[in-house]
Amino acid sequence: MSKKNSKNKAGSSTIALNRTARHEYFIEERVEAGLSLQGWEVKSLRAGKANISEAYVIFMQGEAFLFGSTFLPLNAASSHVVCDPTRTRKLLLSRHELDKLESLTARQGYTIVPLALYWKECWVKVEIGLVKGKKEHDKREDTKAREWDREKARIMKNKHRG
């Protein structure tokens, strides 16, 4: 038997999305990283009990860590394992990627936030983005542009109907 040659996209097997990141930040660059997880965390991710909307990436001793994410334990979790839903999780990146991201975040106004959490085959991956915060007027401009695109689509739809 041959294997299927289907590539998993971030949207096809998504566990959690950070929807506010697109609204709050300009996304400069995207990087895929692995996560170092415990057994109960994998089980809760299979159940879809994850939240990355308040999370961000910090660098300590040359390593990258996901801070502020919440993986809720299942009710049937083992009683002899201490489940900390908000523990800091290590990101698995190459040394080259770590050095590059750490030097880019040293610049004024840049930070790294998780954009999506998803399955890639049997591995949990997190898509992180190098971002810069938006000002209030930038957010308003984006909202106006989105509303105008919606209005244009509505006009074209009605025009084609008759």
From Swiss-Prot:
Single Gene Ontology BP annotation: trans-translation
Source organism, top-level taxon: Bacteria
Biased segments, Basic and acidic residues type: 137-154
Coiled-coil annotated residue ranges, if any: none
Record's GO cellular component terms: cytosol
Pfam families attached to this UniProt entry: SmpB (PF01668)
Localisation: Cytoplasm
InterPro entries in the record: SmpB (IPR023620), SsrA-bd_prot (IPR000037), SsrA-bd_prot_CS (IPR020081)
Keyword Membrane: no
Key words, A-Z: Cytoplasm, RNA-binding
Positions of region (Disordered): 137-162
Gene Ontology MF term list: RNA binding
Signal peptide feature range: none
Function summary: Required for rescue of stalled ribosomes mediated by trans-translation. Binds to transfer-messenger RNA (tmRNA), required for stable association of tmRNA with ribosomes. tmRNA and SmpB together mimic tRNA shape, replacing the anticodon stem-loop with SmpB. tmRNA is encoded by the ssrA gene; the 2 termini fold to resemble tRNA(Ala) and it encodes a 'tag peptide', a short internal open reading frame. During trans-translation Ala-aminoacylated tmRNA acts like a tRNA, entering the A-site of stalled ribosomes, displacing the stalled mRNA.
UniProt record similarity statement: Belongs to the SmpB family.
Protein name per UniProt: SsrA-binding protein
Lineage start: Bacteria, Pseudomonadati, Pseudomonadota, Gammaproteobacteria, Aeromonadales
Gene designation per UniProt: smpB
